[in-house]
């Protein structure tokens, strides 16, 4: 029987499946951070259980860390306790930890791929909703809760029901300057923020194949923002070339054998999906969210929509509420909306290609008066590479703040946050009310678009910036 990529990955990991019971899946990789793991380790300790496979468990610090100092005390008492607990737990249970002073420390979904922890064909979990990022490699990756974190630590397995399947095909080639962030925001704009609920999404089509691995990670990172369980891109030569030579990747003949298997990780011809969505890449322009969920998104050249234009009463009410929170009036051009802060970073857009794209816009320009702009590399290796390329100097000369790795202003769990009423052009993944700080107003954009907003003081079409 013809199978989708998701069905192949799922079936290959079923340990046990009884009639009328949820299947038990084997988990190949477990990524751990300081926020969702303390209670899970406490549970192991209370029952006298070890970590079943510490060699398949990798930990780092990211959510609570300061991006201005490596001082564990910098972000308050709760952050300090969570980080100290992670240090203690990893030492006690034999788990590898990339702590604040480790050169590989960074956002968990940046660290995993760049160290070769993430490989095609794997099941990967983490107590974090954006674990879908790793699906870019053709791995089945999804976020789990703290009780499930404990279960995986103890057993290296997890009960999981089968999801529905969705194919999202982006046909043709994207225009120059259109990034994976624009593509995924356009997709969510079409499906809505709940359009993928109950599904695992496979992204395909020429525009997806053209993306680098970093672009594919951006794409899969935001699958959760359309309600999907996970996002997938089938592995190909782009994937294999990215993985080759990385720290935890197979070497020599093992790598060749792995590629032979990875090449089978494609949806079979004739396999059927429960839902199919199609977009034309050439129609996608630079995207900016205007509301309080990622599906409330328009082209940078559009006007703020009028709630009255929504036929669905629920969407209309949602738009009215969003505009009130965001302090926006219907009908005004998006390019006239001024911003207070810019955040370039997060597990969505903090990799080297993202920083290069932002630096290209920033080079030779200055951050607009009254705007604070942060650039937060996703990991120690990303920061080191950016500095080797001189990107830090470009940003600093333009008036951006060059920070240490961490989740930073993506979420208000550390010192980087918005004040009430402040408006931010952000390369992160969520624009919910209060996500970046109580009363903060978040607009999701690509790194180049964020840099353009920083130097102009308002949203601007990067295609017009020469």
Curated annotation (Swiss-Prot):
EC category name: lyase
> Quaternary form?
Heterodimer of LeuC and LeuD.
**Protein role:** Catalyzes the isomerization between 2-isopropylmalate and 3-isopropylmalate, via the formation of 2-isopropylmaleate.
Q: Which family does it belong to?
A: Belongs to the aconitase/IPM isomerase family. LeuC type 1 subfamily.
Question: Which is an annotated GO molecular function term of this record?
Answer: metal ion binding
Catalyzed reactions per annotation = (2R,3S)-3-isopropylmalate = (2S)-2-isopropylmalate
Which HAMAP family does the entry link to?
LeuC_type1 (MF_01026)
| Required cofactor(s) | [4Fe-4S] cluster
Q: Write the lineage as a comma-separated list.
A: Bacteria, Pseudomonadati, Pseudomonadota, Gammaproteobacteria, Enterobacterales
Q: Which gene encodes it?
A: leuC
Among Pfam families, the record links this protein to:
Aconitase (PF00330)
Q: Which GO annotations describe the biological process of this protein? A: L-leucine biosynthetic process
Name this polypeptide is given: 3-isopropylmalate dehydratase large subunit
Q: Which UniProt keywords apply?
A: 4Fe-4S, Amino-acid biosynthesis, Branched-chain amino acid biosynthesis, Iron, Iron-sulfur, Leucine biosynthesis, Lyase, Metal-binding
- Catalytic activity, EC: 4.2.1.33
State the free-text cofactor note: Binds 1 [4Fe-4S] cluster per subunit.
Top-rank taxon of the source lineage equals: Bacteria
Chain sites annotated for binding [4Fe-4S] cluster = 347, 407, 410
Organism whose genome encodes this protein: Escherichia coli O9:H4 (strain HS)
